Amino acid sequence: NLMESALSGRILKIFPIPNHENSKWVSYLELNEAGLKGMDSTYTKSILPLYFGTLNNAIKTQSYDTSDELLESINGYQKKFGAKVRPSEEKIDLEIAYNKYDVFQKLPYAYLFGAIMMLIFTIIQIFKDRKALRIVINGFHIFIGLLFALHTLGLIARWYISGHAPWSNAYESIIYIAWATMFFGLAFDRKSKLTVASSAFVTAMILAAAYMNWIDPEIANLQPVLNSYWLMIHVAVIVASYGPFALGMILGFVSLLLIFFTNDKNKEKMDLNIQELTYINEMALTIGLVMLTIGNFLGGQWANESWGRYWGWDPKETWALISIMVYAFVIHAR
């Protein structure tokens, strides 16, 4: 749908309707239905074809002065009739930079590189503890920490550009879950370096999933039901709970690998690392369960405000309850 809208030109809503009660903007294809009259109608219907015509000439002459003047004219029209909702120059510049650098598309590769290298050297250190290895591991630890800082700045930038918390759709939820996973991985880094490396690996996998072809990364307006302060509270808590759960998953997998490679010669060192990972795993699952439970109660409050009932046994509510029960059983059965 996004590609179709872009190719047809419908996504380019660049003309504000003067004095519209809802500050509506329309694309060139929608001008006939916009109800513009007089000079406004003449200007909006002629300026874009004229601009594209000058661009064609500019390609041949390599002089874009006329095109730039027409573009500035459109900019002036937007400022005059759409100032109420038009983003500030700072926000526009930031969005251009955000799309230009596309941080979230590059982060999976960087996280994956840091994770694999740190995992390799950390596993080698289990068998041969050398000062040089510790320096290399700490270097990759810092590298992953810098990636997390960049990840955080990307989320903050998207928040500022969109004007709402960046976990309102599938794409934003995925990059936020990835952030939460890496956050808790770094929070537990004092206990085990394997935790940081494992967290970076699963973070890379989660971020890569955000770029599946059915997921739309567009920054869009909130749906009416999501335009609530509960988006900041309920969704932030319940979606962030997936972070420690994802951390628990990857730590469990790494623990199984260590158990598989344990033998009589390395049993003592392996057991120590497995025990550390097990403690961290228990803490991660406990934190995740607490956040999921709190988030579920907050969701009930939001549902009551939006639909007049706390619980309706819809798929999301039902599976949230099932998840709470499953993780509660796992934690109490340890």
Kindly give the residue locations of the regions a language model identified.
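Soluble extramembrane regions of membrane proteins in the secretory/endomembrane system
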Residues: 1-97
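Short, charged, amphipathic alpha-helical segments
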Residues: 65-72, 134-140, 278
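Cytosolic-side membrane-insertion boundary helix
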Residues: 85-116
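Membrane-interface segments at the starts/ends of alpha-helical transmembrane spans
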Residues: 97, 227-231
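Hydrophobic cores of alpha-helical transmembrane segments in multi-pass integral membrane proteins
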Residues: 104-127, 137-164, 168-220, 230-262, ...
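Juxtamembrane inter-helical linkers in multi-pass membrane proteins
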Residues: 262-274
